[in-house]
């Protein structure tokens, strides 16, 4: 069945009368046997309905007769004898008597009464002005703007004639006036088969004889047969031989401009994310001739006409380092780098700081345990070589024999030292243990006797540690006699000095040297600042620093003050009181000067705390100085260190005005370090030397964390 809901026919401007059929609703139709036969005749594919716009914009349909060539091919592979060629001229009188020899399949349809009445009304339509309809050539596809459809089982697209008029015998309005109004909201189940039709545009009668149409092919699936229809237009004398029909064309503008230079095009692709760097050196056109055709072939990369060549020889490709981006940046990167504040704020970086592990003293390694009294023994400063910065006093003739005997006893006892190292945990005492304890007692008594005899030569443990640290100066730096003057020089007689050092300052050498005072520590250091400025004429700049130090002496050296009373206290996180503070300073400075301030009470009550502190701070980056908590003594010590490590600067020399200085300072470098770097290198040479690892001078002034910070800056996405 076919959908009649939107069918309408109108009067055309060149014809007398056209029947106007309007039905805006869908309904169920019942078809009788006679109507089914006529519907079957419409399926013969001898008609075509042309769709056009009539008066008032109402769609109209016009029936056209065409000549078709039908070839029926069985889908199941069986040959049929129903192949035929229908080329007879259409005769309107043949309606109802046409022999459909090419169609064997028939189907019974159920049609209700209303459908019968409608079909009987359609059969009552008759032709008028038949002379106009006798065209020498029937119409086929008139325009390219049409919709092509495939019909399922019943193609109700052909009525009896091209032009229809309304017959006054029956009226559609009189037949169903009330049914559609009542059932308007109830028409939900549509049983009419959906038909897909072939519609073309309608032309006036003046243009129709002069049109010629190209042949086209239509394939229909009708039951088990594949019907292939070739539709050809038949020319006549009145129609021109050739009529050109042009389709709608539009211009396409390509916005991408092709580079005239092949190399420039390749260089531009270096910064493309999806571009492969191997392709940069592999692509080459034959004979280096670059045209638009070659570029188009390059776009179709897999085409056989375009061949890919290596841009370099085989020997050169073997030696080639496949990193064209790196070479391009090294050649074309300008030395001018501007500071971007957004980079320093948004791109935050974190560096894992190395943990500072203090070495612990095991009680069974150093012979300082007195088992009988349950206390620690005194430290042997003369004969013990295990402690760093120790000092050996030359032995006299009377002591040579005793020292030899002691050394023999020690060598004999080392053979049996693994048998029992923890005697106080044993439930019994054997003979081997007694022999070991006797050797230790003899050694201890001998050391006590030597210390009592040489009271003038020995000083307190504190002065010894201080003297040992000062004498443990690297070979590169030598102290002059003007800076340190002791009671007896160490080089002439290797005798331990008495407590305290007599320090003299040469104001001419110290005056004008510049240091930086941390603005966060002004309350603790304001008295020391006044002493240094008034007596030593040292320039002190006050700036708030991100480091937890008191003074910055040069690019790689800082000074920090700590108190001995708080050193061995443990914080909430399980570390020592100053451990995290000292760990942070080792990441920013190659040398950390630690001034440990103590009170006189500690010296008299707990003497062992000094050498314990010294062993805890046994690190190559720490330079430990133990001094009493006296402001004048602290100022003298600081002025001595300033004269050794600091240098002179002008007033305006430490201002950071250039963009290069601001970049380095944004990396948390101190001002002295920034000035020293830019005196030796430009910023470009400095960064280039770090990336290529060609200059070791940078690594001598920077810590590992500072080097890692610069490398993370270079690897950021700009």
UniProtKB/Swiss-Prot annotation:
Keywords: Cell cycle, Chromosomal rearrangement, Chromosome, Chromosome partition, DNA-binding, Meiosis, Nucleotide-binding, Nucleus. One of its GO terms (molecular function) is nucleotide binding. One of its GO terms (cellular component) is nucleus. The keyword Transport does not apply. It comes from the Eukaryota. It is found in: Nucleus; Chromosome. The keyword DNA damage does not apply. One of its GO terms (biological process) is meiotic cell cycle. Belongs to the ZIP2 family. Required for initiation of meiotic chromosome synapsis. Involved in synaptonemal complex formation, a structure that tethers a pair of homologous chromosomes along their lengths and plays a central role in recombination and homolog segregation during meiosis. This is Protein ZIP2. It comes from Vanderwaltozyma polyspora (strain ATCC 22028 / DSM 70294 / BCRC 21397 / CBS 2163 / NBRC 10782 / NRRL Y-8283 / UCD 57-17) (Kluyveromyces polysporus). The gene is ZIP2.
